[in-house]
Amino acid sequence: MGAQVNAAELLQQALSSNIIPNQEFLLQGSILDSAAENLLHRLRGLCDNVDASPETFSDIEMCFSLKLPTEKTPVMTVRVRRAQDVEAPLQLRYIGQPELGDRTRPTLVRSSLDIACTPHVIDFLTEMGFRLDFEYSTKGYMFRKGRMKITVSKILKNMTEPISQSYLVELSVLAPKGQDAIAEDMRIFAEQLKPLVQLEKIDYKRFAQMP
């Protein structure tokens, strides 16, 4: 019991001290397959460890939602990510709604929590009432520039079939609350990728309202 109380106190102290990276800054865009190699070449020149080959990844991502019988929309949505190419823990991820905030802010900002888990996390979610909505695979390249992470990836269905003839490009940073200055650094970096790719704040609510 004492250990549980101590763990709860430590977590509360971490939250109050703003040392937990629970906020994601995000810009997204896409680039045609025919131009992707040019973007990868540009990123090799701009990012850290330019002498090494970019890190590759191949993941399966599953989206689970928890719904109440009286509600049409899910009360909570979480994602489970599993690496296909390396032995690594599964990642349980909660992603919140984008903050409204200042419309002049250069990036989208949303709550985000990532937790390493055992393979039993899927059974755990099912027991809690979560249901699998959909799953997909991603395969691509990852670069780093300081705290910034840049991924260039293909989204696949059935693990092998691309859903489009373009790559998804994402620029993101996980940081504690109160570090909004990183958004300006991301904007400056994104400018260096033009005109190859236009990284923007994506308004998903606008897509949901489309007929």
Swiss-Prot record:
Keywords: Activator, Nucleus, Transcription, Transcription regulation. It is found in: Nucleus. This is Mediator of RNA polymerase II transcription subunit 18. The lineage of its organism: Eukaryota, Metazoa, Ecdysozoa, Arthropoda, Hexapoda. GO terms for cellular component: core mediator complex; mediator complex. Component of the Mediator complex, a coactivator involved in the regulated transcription of nearly all RNA polymerase II-dependent genes. Mediator functions as a bridge to convey information from gene-specific regulatory proteins to the basal RNA polymerase II transcription machinery. Mediator is recruited to promoters by direct interactions with regulatory proteins and serves as a scaffold for the assembly of a functional preinitiation complex with RNA polymerase II and the general transcription factors. InterPro entries: Mediator_Med18 (IPR019095). The keyword Nucleus applies. GO terms for molecular function: transcription coregulator activity. GO terms for biological process: positive regulation of transcription initiation by RNA polymerase II. It comes from Anopheles gambiae (African malaria mosquito). Pfam families: Med18. The keyword Transcription regulation applies. Belongs to the Mediator complex subunit 18 family. Component of the Mediator complex.
